[in-house]
């Protein structure tokens, strides 16, 4: 029971902690703690048989609690989009999020080649996350599509383009006509910048990127939206 309590108080690592004060980092969710508990219980019988423990702990697994998210009305979404018209990248990101129910890590990883403008659809096939140097060593190479260079040499993490955590996250999304038009304008802007910068442009094939082609950190995108 003490170990379960410890897990509930343990701060998250990875993309949920980067760029945040210690007080802002969330603790492990009930779902994550439940998974840890299930893994531990699988080994109790073997541990007893090998005399690592004298008896199997009689503990009750933690309950999972789900937070209900309040859905925004179409009127509220339209109002928000109107307020951020002067920021094309943020506007397109928010438009994509609401139209396709995308997470931030999926938005900043959209592959231009996965978009079918004639059909009005796109495939969600990868995510972009900030990964610590230590965690990168243990990450399966099969899941990694691309590791981006560090912007600062003394940084202890870097952005990584990788496959989704589950097969269910790989999916096809359909786009509304206004969103298709906005994506067309974005791609035209990217092509224009490519011509202007030439070899200095970092072409990563990503729809939501910085002016010179570098990827956008999802934490910065979320921060821009909150502001």
Question: What annotation goes with each model-predicted range?
Answer:
Residues 9, 74, 82, 109, ...:
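Phosphate-coordinating loops and pocket residues in cytosolic domains that bind phosphorylated ligands
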Residues 9-59, 103:
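N-terminal DNA-binding recognition helix of tyrosine site-specific recombinases/integrases
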Residues 11-18, 26, 82, 86-90, ...:
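Short, basic (Lys/Arg/His-rich) helix/loop patches that form interaction surfaces
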Residues 31, 49, 95, 99, ...:
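C-terminal catalytic core of tyrosine-transesterase DNA break-rejoin enzymes
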Residues 32, 36-39, 73, 89-90, ...:
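Hydrophobic (often cysteine-bearing) scaffold residues that line and stabilize catalytic clefts
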Residues 38-45, 91-105, 121-122:
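Short pre-functional
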Residues 49-81, 209-212:
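Flexible interdomain linker/hinge and immediately adjacent N-terminus
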Residues 76, 110-192, 202:
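Conserved tyrosine-mediated DNA breakage-rejoining catalytic core shared by Y-recombinases
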């Amino acid at each position: 029971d003490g170990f379960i309590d410890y897990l509930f108080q343990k701060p998250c690592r990875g993309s949920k902690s980067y760029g945040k004060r210690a007080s802002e980092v969330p603790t492990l969710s009930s779902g994550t703690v439940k998974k840890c508990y299930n893994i531990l219980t699988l080994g109790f019988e073997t541990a007893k048989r090998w005399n690592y423990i004298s008896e199997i702990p009689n503990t009750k697994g933690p309950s999972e609690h789900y937070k209900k998210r309040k859905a925004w009305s179409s009127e509220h979404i339209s109002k928000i989009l109107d307020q951020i018209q002067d920021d094309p990248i943020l506007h397109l990101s928010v438009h994509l999020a609401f139209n396709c129910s995308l997470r931030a890590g999926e938005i900043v990883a959209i592959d231009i080649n996965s978009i079918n403008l004639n059909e009005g659809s796109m495939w969600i096939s990868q995510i972009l996350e900030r990964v610590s140097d230590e965690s990168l060593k243990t990450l399966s190479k099969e899941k990694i599509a691309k590791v981006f260079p560090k912007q600062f040499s003394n940084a202890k993490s870097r952005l990584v383009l990788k496959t989704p955590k589950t097969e269910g996250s790989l999916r096809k999304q359909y786009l509304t006509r206004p969103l298709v038009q906005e994506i067309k304008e974005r791609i035209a802007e990217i092509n224009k910048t490519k011509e202007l910068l030439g070899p200095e442009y970092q072409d990563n094939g990503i729809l939501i990127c910085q002016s010179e082609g570098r990827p956008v950190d999802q934490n910065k995108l979320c921060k821009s939206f909150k502001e």
